[in-house]
């Protein structure tokens, strides 16, 4: 869908990588491995994004590490577009409706790290949740966005953020009762 507006596949991948989850960082060689594209093409797009102020960089050792510039005036708009593109807005909308005492919903896995995937992994945290209703809402969301959704449910006492933080993973808080 967004590929129609933005013809560069590398640019779309970079938008997904950095604007879906603002805590994601990456350096050129890691992007080359992840995207399976040449460093030259990726470098050109990174330079354009950096010059426009969409991403920031810092040197860590001998690596130049990039991340989204969350202070950019268009950051929130781009983030919302990317969320809609991958269907996360529908997932959260469907889950939050009449679900019970929902506390938090996290995005984990490849999508949380800005990688393209047909599977959305979420973690649902709450008390006395209506699990049959949750399953029904997830199935509705899957049909609407044409992606598979895998979920894990934790009660508030069972949940520990460290459990869902694997090395190199950046869980993305999609919804919180405290918001």
Regions found by a protein language model. Name each.
Residues 1-13, 19-47, 51-99, 112-117, ...:
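Catalytic core of pol beta-like nucleotidyltransferases
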Residues 123-125:
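Short hydrophobic/aromatic beta-strand micro-patches
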Residues 107-111:
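Short helix-loop-helix/strand-helix junction enriched in hydrophobic and basic residues
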């Amino acid at each position: 869908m967004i590929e129609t507006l933005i013809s560069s596949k590398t640019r779309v991948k970079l938008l997904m990588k950095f604007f879906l989850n603002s805590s994601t960082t990456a350096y050129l060689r890691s992007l080359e491995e992840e995207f399976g594209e040449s460093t030259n093409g990726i470098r050109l797009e990174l330079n354009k994004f950096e010059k426009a102020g969409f991403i920031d960089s810092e040197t860590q050792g001998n690596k130049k590490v990039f991340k989204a510039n969350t202070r950019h005036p268009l950051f929130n708009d781009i983030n919302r577009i990317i969320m809609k593109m991958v269907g996360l807005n529908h997932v959260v909308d469907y889950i939050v409706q009449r679900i019970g005492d929902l506390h938090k919903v996290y995005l984990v896995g490849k999508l949380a790290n800005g990688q393209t995937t047909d599977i959305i992994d979420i973690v649902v945290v709450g008390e006395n949740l209506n699990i049959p209703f949750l399953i029904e809402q997830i199935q509705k969301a899957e049909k609407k966005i044409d992606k598979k959704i895998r979920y894990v449910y934790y009660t508030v006492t069972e949940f520990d953020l460290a459990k869902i933080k694997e090395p190199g993973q950046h869980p993305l808080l999609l919804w919180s009762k405290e918001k």
